[in-house]
């Protein structure tokens, strides 16, 4: 069966010109999505599942651009939203589409929010929290024409408090829209798939598309000291990293024993051995301290910190630096842990 059969000739022509062939996730997802049924697509990051969800929606909307907000995309991470908005530019430009795209997150200014209400885009990219705010204000009227809701990275919220709030928001949206909307869930490999499907469908029938494949993992545990009982002494310059809000106890001396003096050069060696590296840490304070220490050891800016407390413009700038190869390392919190397209990261 031709996976592109449900798309318009123009969309098929653009896709075949831009890509060699559909990915397995796209081949499995497009026929299911084309039926109008609720669908959950499970596939690993980089499998093209986001385009699988969007291309059918764009194809439908392109027949009547400017008719108001009809496609809603929800993801749990602001950085992912802006990444998706950038990645949509290619297909829309390639199709010569007049469809408009808006982003509504906690970073959106009041002026931009008013403009979204006054002139709703055809496609709105948002977060669960911003969707809740839209539904509990007069702005919910812009959602009446929604026909399709794409729920990305649903495995990250299913079974959590955020997931419960999102599920409630979707049911509220059902009462606002003019007719029932199609739900398309996108998930990384997660088991059991049926449970994630129940979350996406809200108890309604849903078609499960399992395009999950187990990737070959290259895992290595590295301990930068031969004997953990013989940690070197460290000065106050590299004092132990504490969680946010935790202060050093009184009586702490300038010299203590820590593994960090051995970790810093080991991480720097890995950074220098690769074109691009992302180091994940547990909190904002550690991301900033580790990036600063790497730069100090390298005597050059080789690393930048990335976390949710940075302004949106700063986060986007830092992400673009890594993508362009202008900086070899990002030290990030969970702000980059989901399926963001960072290009070729070694």
PLM region descriptions:
Residues 1-13, 21-28, 34-47, 52-346:
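Helicase motor core with emphasis on the C-terminal RecA-like subdomain
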């Amino acid at each position: 069966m031709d996976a592109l059969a449900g798309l318009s000739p123009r969309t098929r022509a653009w896709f075949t010109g831009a890509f060699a062939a559909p990915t397995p996730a796209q081949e499995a997802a497009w026929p299911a999505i084309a039926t109008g049924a609720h669908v959950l697509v499970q596939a690993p990051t980089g499998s093209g599942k986001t385009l699988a969800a969007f291309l059918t929606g764009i194809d439908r909307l392109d027949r009547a651009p400017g008719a108001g907000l009809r496609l809603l995309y929800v993801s749990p991470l602001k950085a992912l939203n802006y990444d998706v908005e950038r990645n949509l530019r290619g297909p829309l430009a390639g199709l010569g589409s007049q469809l408009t795209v808006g982003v509504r997150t906690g970073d959106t200014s009041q002026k931009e929010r008013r403009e979204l209400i006054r002139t709703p885009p055809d496609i709105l990219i948002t977060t669960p929290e911003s969707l809740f705010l839209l539904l509990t204000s007069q702005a919910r009227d812009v959602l009446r024409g929604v026909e399709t809701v794409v729920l990305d990275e649903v495995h990250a919220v299913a079974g959590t408090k955020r997931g419960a709030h999102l599920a409630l928001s979707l049911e509220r949206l059902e009462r606002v829209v003019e007719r029932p909307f199609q739900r398309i869930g996108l998930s990384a490999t997660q088991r059991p798939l049926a449970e994630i499907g129940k979350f996406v469908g809200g108890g309604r029938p849903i078609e499960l598309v399992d395009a999950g494949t187990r990737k070959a993992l290259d895992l290595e545990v590295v301990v930068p000291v031969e004997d953990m009982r013989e940690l070197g002494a460290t000065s106050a310059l590299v004092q132990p990293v504490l969680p946010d809000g935790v202060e050093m106890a009184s009586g702490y001396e300038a010299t203590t024993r820590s593994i960090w003096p051995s970790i810093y050069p080991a991480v720097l060696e890995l950074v220098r051995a690769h074109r691009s590296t992302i180091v994940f840490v547990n909190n904002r304070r550690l991301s900033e301290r580790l990036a600063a220490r790497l730069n100090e050891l390298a005597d050059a800016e080789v690393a930048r910190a990335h976390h949710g407390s940075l302004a949106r413009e700063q986060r986007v700038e830092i992400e673009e630096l890594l993508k362009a190869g202008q900086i070899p390392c990002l030290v990030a919190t969970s702000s980059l842990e989901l399926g963001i397209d960072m290009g070729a990261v070694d």
